[in-house]
A protein has these predicted regions:
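Generic N-terminal segment detector
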Residues: 1-47, 299, 312, 333-336
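Extended, loop-rich substrate-binding clefts of extracytoplasmic carbohydrate-active enzymes
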Residues: 1-10, 19, 87-88, 92-155
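Acidic/His-leaning functional-site neighborhoods
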Residues: 23, 100-114, 231-308, 312-315
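Acidic, contiguous internal or C-terminal segments within carbohydrate-active enzymes
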Residues: 18, 29, 40, 130-180, ...
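Acidic-aromatic substrate-binding/catalytic surfaces of carbohydrate-active enzymes
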Residues: 24-88, 294
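Short Pro-Gly-centered flexible turn/kink motifs
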Residues: 82-91, 162, 318-335
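Active-site/ligand-binding surface loops and adjacent short beta/alpha elements
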Residues: 90, 171-172, 181-276
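Short, hydrophobic/aromatic-enriched beta-strand segments in well-ordered soluble domains
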Residues: 27, 127-129, 264, 323-334
Length: 336
């Protein structure tokens, strides 16, 4: 496969097609710069959930359940309330069943393409969204910021970086999540029921019927939870409804690894989802376990972190001062 990076149209929509190191990636700038597709072409592994017939139509209709969307703000805020050190914001409730505000808004915005290029054996793309009074959500959240995404594809997989810059005169809460949807099964040789997930979980964070944290906010791992640690947690055929964990590191190929490892026990192939230390938590969800996907989601803060009466170092809550930036990085690759 030759290295290339170019803008094309897919399903009638402009996207960025990246090819490098035996991988194929498709970035959808008009849908939050979602990584709409990631494929290990050499080993015929479809890593992320992707609809081949109408990929962009499906993605646009359900941007949290295809590909790799970037969420700001992550997960749920109780009653739509966001408490910041210098203000309290009231967001519209968009999860009527539980009366929460969920998943933020950035994953639905149309980004500007800043750069599309190759550099040796690397394909590189970057996109940007400027959030200000022109955004329809600004009436609820009048805090200007800039969102920058960079994607680098090479033989080591997909490297992702996400930067938020506070362009306002207010404090800006910094919480990031990727609602990453992995394909089940990963290849034609695989069976969905044979997928297993490994996480370096150290504490379980229980939630109530509204999927909000409840005391005690951190519990010791049960026998069920230990399946994640051992890498024996099934992802399909039974419901997983927001298993939330604080994570540490584990050993992968003799190196410290912070993130999730997915094993296809049919073939032995592994998908490694490595995230930086800012992601202190993972939450796992599989839409009742009856679909063709499952979502291990890295989060920089736990659910409803801004509103919890807990120290910031416990919840992962962070704020950016005016003019301040913060970047997180991730990498997805296969081990065959």
């Amino acid at each position: 496969m030759n290295t290339s990076c170019k803008e094309i149209r897919l399903d009638g929509v402009p996207v960025i097609e990246m090819k490098a190191g035996g991988y194929l990636a498709i970035i959808a700038p008009t849908v939050g710069s979602n990584v709409a597709r990631l494929r290990d072409c050499n080993n015929k592994i479809e890593i992320l959930r992707y609809n081949k017939e109408r990929p962009m139509r499906k993605l646009a209709s359900s941007p949290c359940t295809y590909g790799m969307p970037t969420l700001y703000l992550p997960n749920r805020l109780k009653n739509g309330v966001l408490k910041v050190s210098d203000a309290t914001y009231q967001f519209p409730v968009n999860e009527g069943r539980f009366q929460n505000f969920i998943h933020g808004f950035l994953h639905t915005r149309s980004y500007e393409v800043i750069d599309v290029k190759t550099d040796g054996d690397k394909a590189i793309a970057s996109t940007r969204y400027v959030y200000d009074e022109k955004d329809p959500f600004f009436e609820y959240y009048p805090v200007k910021f800039q969102s920058d995404l960079e994607f680098i594809l090479d033989e080591n997989g997909l490297n992702y970086s996400f930067t938020l810059t506070n362009q306002s005169d207010k404090q800006m809460p910094y919480g990031v999540c990727n609602h990453t949807s992995f394909q089940a099964p990963h290849s034609k040789k695989s069976l969905a029921k044979d997928i297993r997930l490994r996480l370096p979980a150290v504490k379980r964070l229980p939630v109530d019927f509204r999927q909000l944290p409840i005391p005690p906010y951190k519990k010791e791992l049960s026998a069920y939870d230990e399946n994640y640690v051992k890498g024996t947690a099934h992802m399909i055929k039974f419901p997983i409804n927001n298993d939330m964990y604080e994570i540490d590191t584990m050993d992968v190929e003799g190196k410290k690894f912070h993130g999730a490892v997915i094993t296809d026990t049919t073939t032995g192939n592994r998908i490694c989802y490595e995230v930086d230390d800012a992601f202190k938590f993972f939450i796992v969800w599989n839409d009742r376990g009856t679909k063709d996907y499952y979502c291990p989601e890295p989060m920089s803060w736990m659910i409803d972190a801004p509103n919890l009466d807990l120290p910031a170092e416990e919840t992962g809550y962070v704020e950016l001062a005016p003019g301040e930036s913060k970047t997180v990085t991730e990498r997805i690759y296969t081990l065959v």
